[in-house]
Amino acid sequence: MNIFDILRDYLLVQVDKYNLNMDMISIVSKSLSSKEAIGNTKRKDFPIIVGKEIMLEADFKGAKGQAFTSTPSTFEGSLKDILSLDLHDNPHDRSLFIASLNAVMKYLGKTDRTIHCKNNEPEVCAKKFPEFIKMEFGNPKVAIIGYQPAIIDNIKDFFETRVLDLNPEFVDTIQYNVKIEDGIRDYEDVISWADLVICTGSTLCNNSIINFLSLNKPVYYYG
């Protein structure tokens, strides 16, 4: 079963369990500016700042959830509308669904951290990665999936590091003394090389997450 079918079925179960009337609940989703999404960061090369990604934010009864997309939009509809989106062939619909799912789960108290960290928080988070990795895995070779500059810069000084990304403007460039490799062309080589994979949650929205769910090595998702 497709992962989005699993997620949709899960949301349906929660709607029934908590008696959420699908026709009466409104979800408002809008695209955020980079300042709204990530604030004033030390680094200015985050994909959302340079215009390579767009943040969707869903608001469900005051609870907010976010997801990345490549297409700006506004949307207002019910949970019934969200559950009817095309999650197989439409990347924008997938992002809208994930943002909405995050908002609903936040509202129900089933998760937290459903919005992106802002201002100096990406740096604070990234600085914790090396200690965590060393404590859990010793001295592994690390594959980072997705261009996240703070994480790359903090990990590469402590561990052998390779980075995969799908954006052609990043691929084959050197960033923070690390070559950014092609997420399709170099996938097999990088994944077979790595002992540990640090993977962006954006892989769920673009459906490339299927390439990382069944790996015979530890995979940690961020964002």
Residue positions per predicted region:
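Electropositive, gly/pro-rich neighborhoods at or near active sites that engage anionic ligands
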Residues: 1-149
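Glycine-rich phosphate-binding "P-loop"
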Residues: 111-122, 171-178, 195
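Short beta-strand/turn micro-motifs composed of small residues
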Residues: 146, 165, 223
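Histidine/lysine/aspartate-rich catalytic loop segments that bind and position anionic ligands
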Residues: 150-181, 185
